[in-house]
Amino acid sequence: TILHHIPENRIKDVIYFNPDDLAHPIGMNLLELPPGLEGDDLLREKDIITESTISVLRKIFSEDDSGGHRIEYVLRNTIQTALTIEGATLFTIFKLLNDSKYRREVTKTLKDEDLKNFWKNEIGKAGDFQRVKMAAGITAKIGRFLFSASAKKILEQEKSTINFDDVLDSGK
């Protein structure tokens, strides 16, 4: 393996990531909020996480996806809603879009008026067919991860087990 070619003095700097190791998956939660944030700092971090997640998922969406801007609008509001839930993961987005009972429970607790209006007016007033169509572009992309055993093990964890800022800052 490649590990045999790493100089001994650098072995502690190596992070071995094997997505097929289902017994010891690295956790990577794209929606994880740092603990202890409040007020404007929390709002700013939620915006950063929302835009970063959209950026990652945009790479999966093809440029010719019809309704790409509409998909991003729905995705942005869904991520912002997910970020109001303790321990939200990428799969929370899927659940919000596809599980009406769960969505009703979550939206009842929302304090943000814009998010309340989105779920009430955009999603709530849409017919079943329209609602499915709005969610389809997003759920098809996230569904790729839901049905991959290795991706699911990595992305469904509430706490990330690797800190990429630390990895980059420490020269690993």
Regions from the language model: what does each represent?
Residues 1-172:
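P-loop NTPase motor domains
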